[in-house]
């Protein structure tokens, strides 16, 4: 079968097609069609010839098969050190083989490659940190995902996710009207406790333009309110854009590079329109990577810089605490043992470990590091889209064991997880293994312990 009704090589560009795909519960028909989806070998090889640059070719050639990447991979470790889980083997037996065969691979090969690309690697790039040749396995697996996506071999949930970005400009069906109404609603809800609090929309020349994850207005609107409360306490001159507010990119997980470009260009257009002094992104790892690290290159910015200076939320919080914009009541600091999850995308891959430790020094009396930690920490177990793929849930749950054991070794009762994927993985970890922990973003914790300036307190009756 050349292409199916649901599983095909075409991106999802219309609301009608998106709703039809969503109606295929669990991707039942989608995956059935995938088993018969023919590989367009000529198009695959033409794609490789056009996009596979010297760096990727060199990495594939210089791998010495030394095995240094093996123990660095948490999936290798939790799968009984199966040699087929060694990162070098995983990439050589998939991407390397596609290139060696000049694209002449069949459906069964692509089905296998899809499973490896999305259930045996989260693109955390911990292995790349230990490679003596500096091979960036995360980049190579991302490239493999792009090739698979172009041929229609992509998990159902991620085909939907990239379609959401194409159709709605967000990873979920949140329209501009929905978003602006959520901002108004959340501001109104806070008036009694936080008089004067606003969520300003489309204010030009603000000091901060805040962007976030579509899950927040869709499922966790209180997160939008919490961000507003902390900006309010800090006295920030800030705004959100009515368009270009969504900074995440499920398209990046899917390997839909055209949708990645579309998504980040919406955010950058908002920056150009509103001209803020800087941008602050929410507590999300992959969103930061998509908008602040990879984004400039997708959007054609050759210098690799965003249109305005960009801060991850942990950078802004650390600055606000350091400068006294937000002050912590010592009596309200976290007293119980607490540990911290390091998001791969902004700790290992963007060097922000000092910011998160600085924050913990202000808010925790008994902070306990995981072992290993900082840039050496392990992936939460659900990154790179792994959390959301039902087909690979069994493998994902097994992958959570490494993080489970790290947390247990600290004796912590609370895990601070300033990243949506990490937050989800640790929530699921507790549901699966029942180890008796709680987990939290930074925002609600800091609000509970912040000293509220007198002029921001509600008048006593």
Curated annotation (Swiss-Prot):
HMWC (high-molecular-weight cytochrome c precursor), ORF2, ORF3, ORF4, ORF5, ORF6 in the HMC operon form a transmembrane protein complex that allows electron flow from the periplasmic hydrogenase to the cytoplasmic enzymes that catalyze reduction of sulfates. ORF6 is a redox protein. One of its GO terms (molecular function) is metal ion binding. Its main location: cytoplasm. The lineage of its organism: Bacteria, Pseudomonadati, Thermodesulfobacteriota, Desulfovibrionia, Desulfovibrionales. Residues 54-84, 112-140 form the 4Fe-4S ferredoxin-type domain. NCBIfam families: sulf_resp_HmcF. It comes from Nitratidesulfovibrio vulgaris (strain ATCC 29579 / DSM 644 / CCUG 34227 / NCIMB 8303 / VKM B-1760 / Hildenborough) (Desulfovibrio vulgaris). One of its GO terms (cellular component) is cytoplasm. [4Fe-4S] cluster 1 binds at residues 63, 66, 69, 127. [4Fe-4S] cluster 2 binds at residues 73, 121, 123-124. It is found in: Cytoplasm. Keywords: 4Fe-4S, Cytoplasm, Electron transport, Iron, Iron-sulfur, Metal-binding, Repeat, Transport. PROSITE patterns: 4FE4S_FER_1. This is Protein DVU_0531. Pfam families: CCG, Fer4_8. Gene3D superfamilies: Alpha-helical ferredoxin.
